[in-house]
Curated annotation (Swiss-Prot):
Catalyzes the interconversion of methylthioribose-1-phosphate (MTR-1-P) into methylthioribulose-1-phosphate (MTRu-1-P). Keywords: Amino-acid biosynthesis, Isomerase, Methionine biosynthesis. This is Methylthioribose-1-phosphate isomerase. It comes from Acetivibrio thermocellus (strain ATCC 27405 / DSM 1237 / JCM 9322 / NBRC 103400 / NCIMB 10682 / NRRL B-4536 / VPI 7372). The gene is mtnA. The lineage of its organism: Bacteria, Bacillati, Bacillota, Clostridia, Eubacteriales. It catalyses: 5-(methylsulfanyl)-alpha-D-ribose 1-phosphate = 5-(methylsulfanyl)-D-ribulose 1-phosphate.
């Protein structure tokens, strides 16, 4: 179920736009293909996007044919800018590209071939770190999950959104593996249906009981007492704990608070943007109207209707019970406690 695999200058991605009906691997051999794959959501999920971007820089560096370090770094910087322009909200994308570029710059005294190898090694290290991080998030998050709980999740923050195991689904997996009798309610997550297509599929692969619901049913099931907690992933977390995640997350958080249900965010510390104070500074990606007006190429809305399609929303920190990271669980007040995890 790994969404990505890199070997000998070729990045293989599981095309997530085709799941669950078709499991197709696409092979990317240049950075333009990598950038397009990120933009078109062949790969998605903040951690997976970050590592994919890092491998994209590695692939690009191999193709730069020059003996001039000045030309090499100028071309490498252009590549980094192009990859970073693909999706504006997920901070892991920028963090990952900047990290591999910094590794190259800090070793400027080495030969160009040695620098290329170091970029590749850094990307591989990031993949390894992500998997370890997700396992740790799962272990910490499992401490919050009680026997016989029903967990509501939104979008897909599982193995498909990371390099393996997952963040929000990592917590769910850890609880299941520890023997707890849990079940999951998965929002379908309009308009891209990551919950229906990806989360439900992932959980069924692992034999974790899952019930699929429409997004607008969540409040009903909370009021009926059928939901014990909500766990979601994150694409960017501000210093005060405000969290950007898939559109619809904010609504779930408000509903959870109204019904006295704990609302947890599970994310690695690489998703924390220490450069911004609040969620108001997080850019929100607006995607194609066709994602709303069409399903599988079939029009479901009137021709010419106006459409808004923000891909993310920001959940204010007051609705978040805790943030589960690989370094531990962060509780309010977030503006005091998050900075301790830098």
């Amino acid at each position: 179920m790994k969404p990505l695999e890199y070997c000998n200058g070729v990045l293989k991605l599981l095309d997530q736009t085709l799941l669950p009906g078709e499991q197709k691997i696409v092979e990317l051999k240049n950075y333009i293909e990598v950038a397009d794959a990120i933009k078109n959501m062949i790969v998605r999920g903040a951690p997976a996007i970050g590592v994919t971007a890092a491998y994209g820089v590695a692939i690009a560096s191999k193709a730069i044919n020059t003996d001039s370090k000045e030309e090499f770094f100028a071309e490498l910087a252009k590549v980094c800018d192009i990859i970073k322009s693909t999706r504006p909200t997920a901070v892991n994308l920028f963090w990952a590209v900047d990290r591999v570029y910094s590794r190259a710059v800090s070793n400027r005294d080495k030969t160009i071939e040695e620098i290329k190898k170091l970029i590749e090694e850094e990307a591989y290290l990031m993949e390894k770190e992500d998997i370890e991080s997700n396992r740790s998030i799962g272990r910490f998050g499992n401490e919050l999950i009680k026997e016989n709980w029903t967990i509501l999740t939104h979008c897909n923050a599982g193995a498909l959104a990371t390099c393996d195991y997952g963040t929000a689904l990592g917590v769910i997996r850890a609880a299941h593996e520890s023997g707890k009798n849990i079940q999951v309610f998965a929002d379908e997550t309009r308009p891209y249906l990551q919950g229906a297509r990806l989360t439900a599929w992932e959980l069924m692969q692992d034999n974790i009981p899952v019930t699929l619901i429409c997004d607008n049913m969540a409040g009903h099931f909370m009021k009926e007492g059928l939901i014990d907690c909500v766990i979601v992933g994150a694409d960017r977390i501000a210093l005060n704990g405000d969290t950007a995640n898939k559109i619809g997350t904010y609504s779930l958080a408000v509903l959870a608070k109204e019904n006295n249900i704990p609302f947890y965010v599970a994310a690695p510390t690489t998703t924390i943007d220490f450069s911004i104070e609040t969620g108001e500074q997080i850019p929100i990606e607006e995607r194609s109207p066709a994602e709303i007006t069409h399903i599988k190429g079939i029009r479901i809305a009137p021709e010419g209707v106006k459409v808004r399609n923000p891909a993310f929303d920001v959940t204010p920190n007051k609705y978040i019970s805790a943030i589960i990271t690989e370094k531990g669980i962060i509780y309010p007040p977030y503006d005091e406690n998050i900075k301790k995890y830098r």
